[in-house]
């Protein structure tokens, strides 16, 4: 370390898109990168997901000295950088999908739940992008960081904090250099199961020299007062959402009720199973994910074409035919064969895939239920802070510099406590 050393922050991706933030903090010969996701743009209809294609379409950042040279063809400058590390905030693909592209010698940190769940989610090789020289279902080593325990990366220290998002085990990050502190929220909200965790992170981050905050909640100003706004309709918090699913069951005692949720929203699923008046039955693939990651057993069923999982308890299997014939005993997760559901039934789509109107697959997916005279109810609870919550988080941290990312409209987030910068891709800020 010399007197001339400065903390720099370089913004490589995810600045005016929903997802895909890639940001480097550097000091002297040490640097860290977060996150490692891919921007979701299904409308591009890309020919492949090669490194070159992703770079060309700006779906990942063109970050030097972090990607695997086997993929980029460019060596890592180990003379310039003596200490390197990377971090992912949570399970969602716009923050994790390209982690296998990281050079294998660079340590990758995540919260303990994220580190444990990612290999399980990628068991079939269809979650993460593949690593060079490995089978497609390989997941590179991820170090499960202890919450709030400092991680030394040369002159830089990382501290990982539990947070709240609709991905199980989401975290926020504090990056400390010899002269500055940078806080990164990852994806964050105050209306989930753990607002107390978010407030503890806000307290730890208070007065940071820079706050890098997601801004999904200000991405649709034209829908600000629209009751049909896709991101912020329905229940105002996760507890209300669970209660509404219970109410729908109680209001429809003699009706087939099915549902689906997003695989990484494990906590919502656990709450539904815990509170449901009906017996909840999961598709075997989801039951296997829960067993593999949490070592907990739940009732499940197989579709006729499904492979069998040796870790599932045979005594908990429910036959698919029994579920199709049922209209009062079960609340079950349906993932296909929607035309086999009972006419007049009810299907609850709770932030499951396809995720919404921005996905070309969503409209035909919804329309098939009407065609089969099945009521379709979308029950969403956003994983992201809305405009009011974003102001509260910024107000709790009171940063010197605010950098909104992960939003279509970063200019709509303001910093009453200091400066706000709106960096371009590849731009470096010196603190």
Positions of predicted regions on the chain:
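C-terminal regulatory/interaction regions
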Residues: 1-2, 12, 16-17, 274-278, ...
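His/Asp/Glu-rich metal-coordinating catalytic cores
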Residues: 2-17, 21-85, 94, 98-264, ...
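Short connector loops at secondary-structure junctions
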Residues: 37-39, 214-223, 285-296, 380-389
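Short, charged, surface-exposed secondary-structure boundary motifs
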Residues: 43-45, 118-123, 170, 193-195, ...
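Short internal beta-strands
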Residues: 106-116, 212, 279-289, 348-351, ...
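Short, charged/polar "capping" segments at the starts of alpha-helices
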Residues: 116-119, 221, 287-292, 355-358, ...
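Hard-cation-handling environments
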Residues: 226-335, 339-341, 405
């Amino acid at each position: 370390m010399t007197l001339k050393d400065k903390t720099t922050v370089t913004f490589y991706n995810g600045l005016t898109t929903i997802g895909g933030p890639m940001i480097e903090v550097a000091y002297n010969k040490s640097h860290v990168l977060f996150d490692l996701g891919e921007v979701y743009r299904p409308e591009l209809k890309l020919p492949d997901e090669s490194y070159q294609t992703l770079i060309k379409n700006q779906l990942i950042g063109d970050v030097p000295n972090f990607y695997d040279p086997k993929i980029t063809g460019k060596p890592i400058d180990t003379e310039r950088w003596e200490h390197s590390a990377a971090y992912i905030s949570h399970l969602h693909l716009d923050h994790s999908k390209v982690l296998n592209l990281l050079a294998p010698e660079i340590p990758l940190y995540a919260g303990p739940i994220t580190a444990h769940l990612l290999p399980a989610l990628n068991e079939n090789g269809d979650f993460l992008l593949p690593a060079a020289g490995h089978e497609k279902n390989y997941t590179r080593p991820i170090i499960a960081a202890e919450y709030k325990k400092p991680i030394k990366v040369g002159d830089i220290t990382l501290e990982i904090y539990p947070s709240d998002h609709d991905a199980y085990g989401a975290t926020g990050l504090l990056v400390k250099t010899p002269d500055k502190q940078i806080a990164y929220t990852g994806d964050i909200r105050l209306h989930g199961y753990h607002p107390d965790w978010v407030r503890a992170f806000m307290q730890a981050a208070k007065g940071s020299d820079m706050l890098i905050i997601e801004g999904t909640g200000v991405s649709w100003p034209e829908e600000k007062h629209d009751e049909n706004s896709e991101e912020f309709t329905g229940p105002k918090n996760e507890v209300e959402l669970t209660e509404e699913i219970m109410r729908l069951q109680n209001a429809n005692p003699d009706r087939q009720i099915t549902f689906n949720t997003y695989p990484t929203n494990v906590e919502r699923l656990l709450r539904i199973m815990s509170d449901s008046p009906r017996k909840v039955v999961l598709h075997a693939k989801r039951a296997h994910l829960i067993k593999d990651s949490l070592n907990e057993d739940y009732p499940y069923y197989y579709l006729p074409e499904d492979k069998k999982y040796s870790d599932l308890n045979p005594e908990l299997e429910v036959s698919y035919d029994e579920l199709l014939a049922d209209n009062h005993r079960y609340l079950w997760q349906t993932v296909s064969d929607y035309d086999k559901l009972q006419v007049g039934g009810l299907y609850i789509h709770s932030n499951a895939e396809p995720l919404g109107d921005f996905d070309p697959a969503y409209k035909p997916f919804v329309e098939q239920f009407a065609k089969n005279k099945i009521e379709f109810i979308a029950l969403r609870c956003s994983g992201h802070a809305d405009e009011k919550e974003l102001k509260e988080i910024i107000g709790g941290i009171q940063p010197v510099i605010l950098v909104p990312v992960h939003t279509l409209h970063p200019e709509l987030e303001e910093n009453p406590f200091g400066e706000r910068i709106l960096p371009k891709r590849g731009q470096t800020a010196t603190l």
